[in-house]
């Protein structure tokens, strides 16, 4: 099964680390973000939605896998400053 997720890296001057906004393909608004906590660990922030929302197991594992790749990259960027 194809996972139809879009990951957008966002840099924010108010955040110590960049974060990833996660979209379902074809949607304009993200449903969650993957960020790095002050403790330098992955955080998953889910946004409120008016409709019921679900993820397949493939999508869920795809998000987690992307987060595991993103964490060391985000930390490396911060450590190099």
Q: Residue locations for each model-derived region?
A:
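Alpha-helical transmembrane segments and their juxtamembrane interfaces
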Residues: 6, 37-39, 76
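A short, structured beta-strand/loop element
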Residues: 17-55
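Mixed-charge, Lys/Arg-enriched low-complexity segments
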Residues: 41-81
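Negatively charged, low-complexity tracts enriched in Asp/Glu with abundant Ser/Thr
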Residues: 1-23
């Amino acid at each position: 099964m194809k996972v139809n997720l879009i990951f957008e890296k966002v840099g924010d001057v108010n955040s110590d680390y960049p974060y990833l906004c996660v979209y379902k393909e074809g949607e304009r608004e993200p449903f969650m973000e993957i960020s790095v906590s002050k403790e330098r660990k992955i955080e998953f922030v889910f946004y409120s939605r008016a409709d019921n929302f679900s993820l397949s197991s493939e999508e869920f594992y795809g998000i987690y896998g992307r987060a595991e790749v993103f964490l060391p990259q985000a930390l490396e960027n911060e450590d190099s400053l």
